[in-house]
């Protein structure tokens, strides 16, 4: 019994060490698609004080390539789902300066030539960006009909998003996500890939040692069953 308790303790320590190791790679450090998505957010004015929140989120919401890269940035599926499903609703938020009231376009929109739509169309009235809805509800979507693939992929993601973000394993993700919607225009956002720190050699060595020791104990336990 003591051996089993020790074995599970080592497994738990190994998992905790692995979480500590990958937290520096949360979201933008995952892969090339995440890096491209980060650059696209900077292009839309993530750290530009002259770009309003509505312009910034509308620029991202209307960028099909951004959603594609974000969907492929799947190191943490629940976080990717949360960001992609919320960013368009942020584009409709009221402001004393302006209110974005347009629909997604097949064109990529930059902040330099952005202008609000004059059409009386609202995301909140016509399309609800939840895990159960599909972009095909909009009959005028042509290129965006491919979002049905995205919707079906998203539906398989975990639905308990906030509870996942609150776990200690991805606290770095929660901080990154929060910076999008509360302080997207400041230079303190974590979207800048220069803030990503890679694990030191000592961290990798410790994790490897813990993993090897855990494997040895597991092997001995398995062997004892037949002796």
From Swiss-Prot:
Main location: secreted
Coiled coil: none
Keyword Lipoprotein on entry: yes
Membrane topology, record value: Lipid-anchor; GPI-anchor
Propeptide segment residues: 201-227
Residues listed as glycosylation sites in the UniProt record: 192
Residue positions of covalent lipid attachment, annotated as GPI-anchor amidated serine: 200
Signal sequence annotation: 1-16
Top-level division of the source organism's lineage: Eukaryota
One GO term describing the cellular component: extracellular region
Keywords of the record: Cell wall, Glycoprotein, GPI-anchor, Lipoprotein, Membrane, Secreted, Signal, Virulence
Keyword Glycoprotein annotated: yes
Induction per the UniProt record: Up-regulated upon milbemycin A3 oxim derivative (A3Ox) treatment.
Compartments, record wording: Secreted, Cell wall; Membrane
Record PTM: The GPI-anchor is attached to the protein in the endoplasmic reticulum and serves to target the protein to the cell surface. There, the glucosamine-inositol phospholipid moiety is cleaved off and the GPI-modified mannoprotein is covalently attached via its lipidless GPI glycan remnant to the 1,6-beta-glucan of the outer cell wall layer.
Summary of the function given for this chain in its UniProt record: Probable GPI-anchored cell wall protein that may be involved in cell wall organization, hyphal growth, as well as in virulence.
Family, per entry: Belongs to the IHD1 family.
This protein's name: Probable cell wall protein PGA42
Gene: PGA42
């Amino acid at each position: 019994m003591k051996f089993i308790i020790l074995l599970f303790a080592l497994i738990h320590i190994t998992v905790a060490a692995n979480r500590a190791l990958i937290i520096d790679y949360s979201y933008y450090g995952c892969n090339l698609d995440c890096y491209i998505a980060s650059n696209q957010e900077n292009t839309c004015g993530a750290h530009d004080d002259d770009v309003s929140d509505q312009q910034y989120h509308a620029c991202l919401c209307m960028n099909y390539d951004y959603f594609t890269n974000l969907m492929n940035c799947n190191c943490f599926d629940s976080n990717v789902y949360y960001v992609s499903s919320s960013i368009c609703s942020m584009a409709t938020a009221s402001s004393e300066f302006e209110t974005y009231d347009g629909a997604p376009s097949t064109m990529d929109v930059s902040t330099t030539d952005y202008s609000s739509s004059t059409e009386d169309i609202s995301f909140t009235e016509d399309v609800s960006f939840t895990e159960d809805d599909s972009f095909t509800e909009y009959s005028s979507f042509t290129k965006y009909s491919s979002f049905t693939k995205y919707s079906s992929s998203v539906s398989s993601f975990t639905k308990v998003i906030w509870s996942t973000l609150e776990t200690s394993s991805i606290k770095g993700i929660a901080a990154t996500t929060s910076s999008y919607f509360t302080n997207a225009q400041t230079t303190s956002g974590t979207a800048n890939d220069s803030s990503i720190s890679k694990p030191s050699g000592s961290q990798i060595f410790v994790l490897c040692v813990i993993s090897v020791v855990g494997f040895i104990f597991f092997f001995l336990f398995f062997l004892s069953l037949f002796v």
